[in-house]
């Protein structure tokens, strides 16, 4: 069968790579893909992003299964368009994707269905937002309502920082429409984890747990980013926490959406804050897999992903289980100069062959130049991912592999995995 993956990031490289390992797959197309997917022997890039053109391509190439990676096409209704054309596609509809595309929608949904989350208020008037901040004090969290590529959240440790964030979003319109409304919520403490599942409308299949590293610099300092590295499994997600997350967050979300008349199918990612006492609060929902969490998760997945996705599309996820490599997988993001502000592009990359021993180099912001060499084309450039028997071993191997990859201005964290390694 022919399969299509929509997107061009590290997550899509990992999904396409895993789908192509299925014995049932003939061709895997990636639209538009990147240099990494271009270099993979079993993947073919197609330079299409327009939804109608994607539908026509899927019909022409007899694509029997499509998997959507990023949030933007989901929020634009790519799933609705494919379904209308009678094509099988895995992902939430435009209505269901509001769980990610509108923070206010998600918060109101959680409040309505009793899903644990931080207290909040939504504002489109800057003066009212400033008054609320003064009343609440710092630390406090300011979030753009709309999609902002992981950069719409400011964890303000001071009142000044909070007021500046509101001005930047509401008054200066720095994030455009995404920041026309802001959600201001209480600051939560604890440890974060990424809880990602597959949903078929009613049944849920949990994927391996993972943990992301959001801040740009070591020791979790610097600005928030789309994610600078991740590992799987996440020791903070104990069997008790796993059961609690399914019971208190995931199942009420799937059932709540259905009660609201919106059937949810697709990947669902709950960003959880886990308190030292083991209480859960939902920080955010994403209607897709995380990036870079997908990379270590796909490295560990032993099951046929095509089979899992087909069951999800058919509404029979209760008939399958996922099998995981018991080893740890850890991925380190290599980012471009000036990321996350205005990343520099066009730098030639050496040593980034995807296939490596004990791991894989997943490409994100890369494309091939006129000479067929990979070069930087975005903020997060690569995710160097490796296996290890322990967190320490996976970390050591990933950094060994990373040492062989180079491009000008490259930046990465040197402490990915520190929480798991220092955990008592």
Task: Describe each model-derived feature in a short phrase.
Residues 1-94:
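ATP-binding N-terminal substructure of ATP-dependent carboxylate-amine bond-forming enzymes
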Residues 156-294:
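Internal nucleotide-binding/catalytic subdomain
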Residues 20-23, 37-39, 60, 90, ...:
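Solvent-exposed alpha-helices and their adjacent loops that cap or buttress functional pockets
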Residues 366-371, 375-424:
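Generic C-terminus detector
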Residues 5, 30-31, 67-68, 89-92, ...:
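General beta-strand structural signal in soluble alpha/beta enzymes
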Residues 246-268, 286-358, 369:
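Active-site "cap" helix and flanking loop/linker of ATP-utilizing ligase/carboxylase catalytic domains
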Residues 4-5, 99-181, 211, 235-251:
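Active-site nucleotide/adenylate-binding loops and adjacent lid/helix of ATP-dependent enzymes
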């Amino acid at each position: 069968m022919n399969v299509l993956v929509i997107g061009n990031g590290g997550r899509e490289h990992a999904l396409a790579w895993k789908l192509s390992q299925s014995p049932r797959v003939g061709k895997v197309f990636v639209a538009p893909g990147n240099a990494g997917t271009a270099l993979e022997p079993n993947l073919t890039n197609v330079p299409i992003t327009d939804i109608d053109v994607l539908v026509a391509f899927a019909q022409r190439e007899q694509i029997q299964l499509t998997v959507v990676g990023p949030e933007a096409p989901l929020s634009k209704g790519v799933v609705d368009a494919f379904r209308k054309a009678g094509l099988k596609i895995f992902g939430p509809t435009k209505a269901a994707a509001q769980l990610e595309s509108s923070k206010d929608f998600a918060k109101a949904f959680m409040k309505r269905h009793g899903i644990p989350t931080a207290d909040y208020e939504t504002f489109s008037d800057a003066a009212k937002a400033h008054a609320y901040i003064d009343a609440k004090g710092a630390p406090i969290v300011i979030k753009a309502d709309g999609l902002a590529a992981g950069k719409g959240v400011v964890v303000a440790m001071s009142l000044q920082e909070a007021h500046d964030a509101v001005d930047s979003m509401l008054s200066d319109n720095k994030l455009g429409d995404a920041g026309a409304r802001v959600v201001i919520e209480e600051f939560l403490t604890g440890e974060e984890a990424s809880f990602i599942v597959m949903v078929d409308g009613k049944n849920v299949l949990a994927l391996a747990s993972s943990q992301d590293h959001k801040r740009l610099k070591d020791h979790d300092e610097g600005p928030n980013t789309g994610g600078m590295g991740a590992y799987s499994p996440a020791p903070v997600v104990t069997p008790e926490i796993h059961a609690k997350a399914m019971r208190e967050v995931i199942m009420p979300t799937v059932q709540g959406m259905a009660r609201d008349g919106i059937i949810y199918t697709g990947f669902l990612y709950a960003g959880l804050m886990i308190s030292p006492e083991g209480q859960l609060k939902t920080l955010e929902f994403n209607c897709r897999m995380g990036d870079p969490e997908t990379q270590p998760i796909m490295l560990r997945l032993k099951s046929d992903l095509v089979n899992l996705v087909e069951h999800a599309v058919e509404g029979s996820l209760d008939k399958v289980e996922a099998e995981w490599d018991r080893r740890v997988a850890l991925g380190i993001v290599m980012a471009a100069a000036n990321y996350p502000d205005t990343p520099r592009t066009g730098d030639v990359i050496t040593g980034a062959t995807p296939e490596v021993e004990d791991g894989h180099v997943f490409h994100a912001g890369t494309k091939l130049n006129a000479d067929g060499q990979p070069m930087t084309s975005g903020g997060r450039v690569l995710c160097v991912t490796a296996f290890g028997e322990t967190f320490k071993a996976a970390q050591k191997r990933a950094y060994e592999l990373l040492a062989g990859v180079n491009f000008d201005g490259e930046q990465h964290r040197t402490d990915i995995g520190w929480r798991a390694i220092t955990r008592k």
